A protein has these predicted regions:
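Alpha-helical transmembrane bundle and helix-membrane interface signal
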Residues: 141-143, 201-206, 229-243
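Flexible interhelical linker loops that connect adjacent transmembrane helices
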Residues: 14-15, 190-219, 261-276, 337-338, ...
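Short juxtamembrane and helix-loop transition motifs at transmembrane-helix boundaries
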Residues: 140-147, 173-179, 203-209, 305-313
Length: 482
């Protein structure tokens, strides 16, 4: 049994400067980069995988959908497992499972095996993603150190998708689509070996029963919501399937909240959501991802379908966004976070990103990469990084360390739901606008893209408004390290 003196000794050790914490940050970042890359790297390889495995056009979406459903649906469970089992154990288990799933997918002899492997990847990503963020939240508690650590995390979140497109293009064009999955193996091994050596012990763990009814309700509600958004892209929001899924999601999530408010050992303690600053950060993350993700997808299609870029060229075309995201994370967010209130970064950042979206509304079928796409990517990269770095920090700040896993899972779930909703909503807007446009196919597509991007800009402005109104936290103050 631990004593108060032992507890003080543990805190004292944690407060001592330790190089191993920064080494640990490097391996946590490697793991997070693997997850971020996987969001887009397989999308580039999908046409080649479809042809090689003989999948139909109707079935190919399941390579993406299987990952999205398991990732989004299991995040809260994954975060709570980290709290129960310990962060180091959960981190290593997530890496091992993700690597095995990637190996199965890379060697898949059939399309069905590939889909199952992608579902397994999503399940282990749902364990790994909140665990990685939780490790950052409890390891780096002083304002300057926290700003640096979350700048690393934010730069990966902002540029990982773009890097995934580039890497996917290189691997598909010069090797084979299977390497878009195999590439995770060496990355996971490096992160796992490093994590095993330098990560601290699992620390305080929750000594309580797992809320199995809460797990079932949360998983069913999130899966139904994410699947409804996915299905709406092809079937429309008025289809019976989508309406049924949305109804199921609403009912099960309402029952989940009812359950969590009354059980002694909730899966998601509602006090985590009730905090004004954390709740505001969750909403901002969801809105920013919703506004950005749909337009990000459309821009990929624009470059390859309208401008006829190869997958590799399209990946290279996204490099400015990645560079700008790194610059925004390190030169702006990391420097200013210890000195200003979170909303002083988040609101202007969202407005800068909205300006980048507004530029994209001016695209033409003839193309204007240097005049429009390039500056838009720079604005998007700078703006998004200045939102995400303080948002992720605020969403996990001052949380009981025994609940840091589920708190980290909640902000990841907000990101996942935001991406799914944004893609579905903006796709609906784009299709409707293109259908009502009298002109050539390319012109109609670009018109639909422009209208959808305008809506994306509006969503980003709304994110700036939410950050200004809801997030009232002041300048970061030092607090006791965990």
């Amino acid at each position: 049994m631990s004593t108060p003196a032992a507890g003080r000794e543990e805190v004292s050790r944690a407060a001592e400067p330790s190089r191993s914490r920064w080494t640990a940050l490097a391996f946590i970042a490697v793991a997070q980069l693997m997850i971020a890359l996987d969001a887009t790297i397989v999308s580039i390889a999908l046409p080649s995988a479809q042809a090689a495995l003989g999948a139909s056009d109707a079935d190919r979406q399941w390579v993406v959908t299987a990952y999205t459903l398991s990732f989004g649906g299991l995040l809260l469970l994954g975060g709570r497992i980290a709290d129960f089992a310990g962060r180091k154990r959960a981190f290593l288990l997530g890496l091992a499972g993700f690597a095995v799933a990637s190996m199965i997918g890379g060697a898949a002899p059939s399309f069905a095996v590939l889909v199952v492997a992608r579902a397994l990847q999503g399940a282990f990503a749902a364990l790994l993603a909140p665990t990685a963020l939780s490790l950052l939240a409890v390891t780096f508690t002083q304002p300057r150190e926290r700003a640096t650590a979350f700048a690393v995390y934010g730069s990966i979140a902002g540029s990982g998708a773009a890097i995934g497109l580039l890497l996917g293009g290189v691997l598909t064009q010069y090797l084979t689509w299977r390497w878009c999955l195999y590439v995770n193996l060496p990355v996971a091994i490096v992160a796992a070996v490093g994590g095993w050596i330098v990560l601290p012990g699992s620390g305080a763990r929750v000594r309580a029963r797992l809320d199995l009814p809460g797990v079932a309700l949360a998983t069913a509600g999130l899966v139904a919501l994410v699947y409804a958004c996915t299905e709406a892209v092809s079937s429309g929001w008025s289809s019976a399937t989508v309406i049924g899924l949305l109804t199921t999601s609403f009912v099960t999530l309402a029952l989940f909240v009812f359950r969590e408010a009354r059980t002694a050992h909730p899966l998601l303690p509602l006090r985590i959501l009730a905090d004004r600053n954390r709740g505001g950060a969750y909403i901002v993350v969801a809105l920013v991802i919703a506004g950005m993700f749909g337009a990000f997808l459309f821009l990929t299609y624009y470059l390859q379908t309208v401008l006829h870029y190869t997958p590799l060229q399209a990946g290279l075309a996204f490099l400015p966004l990645s560079v700008a995201s790194q610059a925004g994370s390190w030169l702006i967010a990391s420097s200013l976070m210890p000195h200003v209130a979170p909303r002083a970064l988040m609101a202007p950042g969202a407005l800068v990103a909205a300006a980048g979206m507004a530029l994209l509304t001016q695209l033409q079928p003839a193309g204007a990469y240097l005049l429009l796409v390039l500056p838009a990517e720079v604005l998007l990269g700078l703006g998004i990084s200045c939102v995400m770095v303080p948002a992720f920090s605020t969403a996990t700040q001052r949380v009981d360390p025994r609940e840091s896993g589920v708190a980290s899972a909640t902000v990841n779930a907000a990101s996942q739901v935001g991406g799914s909703l944004g893609t579905a909503l903006l796709n609906t807007v784009a299709v409707s606008a293109a259908a009502g446009f009298a002109g050539a196919q390319a012109a109609a597509f670009v018109h639909g893209f422009s209208v959808a991007t305008a809506w994306g800009a509006v969503i980003l402005v709304l994110a700036a408004l939410v950050a200004t109104v809801l997030i009232s936290a002041g300048r970061p103050q030092p607090h006791r390290p965990i």
